[in-house]
């Protein structure tokens, strides 16, 4: 399965200035902490206002360490086009889904590669513990 990689950067105008957001390792990890499963992507986009707000504010804060909510940009101080905000959320969702899909594909390949070995180890461990073969 060939899954295209999302763009590493996203351009958005904030307060009249062009800003480029780069999906760095640290930024991606912070997003993954609040979106632990692909099923939550729908919540991010549609139903969970708090999750959506955090993701937007975190992205607009940039690649710096955030330890408290006060470290995030204040949404009331932002002059930003809402359509671009929706596109930003979709860009983040694309990165998260890409990660889960690529990880699942890699894990499936590893499972196929070692299936016989795992079955043999399972059989051996059962026979050593007295379980029937």
Question: Where are the predicted features?
Answer:
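Short, surface-exposed, charged amphipathic helix/loop patches that serve as local interaction elements
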Residues: 2-7, 25-133
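Short, isolated positions in well-ordered beta-strands
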Residues: 19-21
């Amino acid at each position: 399965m060939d899954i295209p990689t999302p763009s590493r950067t996203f351009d958005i105008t904030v307060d009249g200035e062009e800003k480029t957001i780069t999906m760095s390792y640290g930024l991606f990890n912070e997003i993954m902490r609040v979106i632990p499963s692909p099923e939550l992507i729908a919540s991010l986009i549609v139903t969970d206002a708090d999750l959506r707000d955090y993701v937007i504010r975190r992205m607009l804060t940039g690649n710096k360490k955030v330890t408290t909510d006060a470290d995030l940009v204040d949404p009331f101080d932002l002059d930003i086009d809402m359509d671009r905000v929706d596109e930003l959320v979709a860009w983040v969702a694309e990165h998260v889904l890409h990660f889960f899909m690529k990880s699942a594909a890699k894990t499936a390949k590893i499972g196929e590669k070692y299936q016989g070995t795992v079955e043999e180890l399972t059989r051996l461990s059962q026979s050593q513990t007295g379980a029937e073969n």
